[in-house]
Amino acid sequence: SLCMDFVMNHTSQEHEWAKRAVAGEREYQDRYFFFDNFDIPAQYEKTCPQVFPTTAPGNFTWLDSCHKFVMTTFYPYQWDLNYANPVVFNEMTANMLYLVNQGIDIVRIDAVPYIWKQIGTTCRNLPQVHTIVRMMRMITEIVCPGVLLLGEVVMEPSKVVPYFGTLEKPECHMLYNVTTMASTLSLIHI
């Protein structure tokens, strides 16, 4: 089986969408979280914890090239996608389907809990994330039923399990627990 890492939360700053956003194309800026000043980012920062506070502090990056802030949950060169814009979901799903039609058997969905952003929340594990994963599952079941979705959910176990979904509303076929993997690896090296 061939497994592919599918990064849904963000693109690189080198991606075509990002380059067009920096060039001032509003359609592409709307695929990300672009802001003219820090007023709205400051609202996010009140409740959204930092992933890497020492190596990549904050959740936003100032872009000198276009004089705007962009949301960057992980690193300054990884720009968060705005799934409130339906174009993002449609394009990302089309990209995933293109790749699975090239022979991918397992789609590893990277950084699943971070996909949806909402002011006043931690921007993690929100109900909309589960809806997005469920829609991906329904689409793959129809278009390419042999494909499995593997979710990367780096959270405590109580937050990992819900990404399986329910019998009526299944989400990921498989999940892995990074904490267990790291603990197992450290035991091997003792």
Question: Where do the protein language model's features map onto the residues?
Answer:
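Acidic/aromatic-lined carbohydrate-recognition and catalytic surfaces
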Residues: S1-T93, L97, N101, V112-A182
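Short loop/turn motifs at secondary-structure junctions
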Residues: G103-D105
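Hydrophobic residues within beta-strands of alpha/beta enzymes
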Residues: V107-I109
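Conserved small/polar residues in nucleotide/adenosyl-binding loops
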Residues: I188-I190
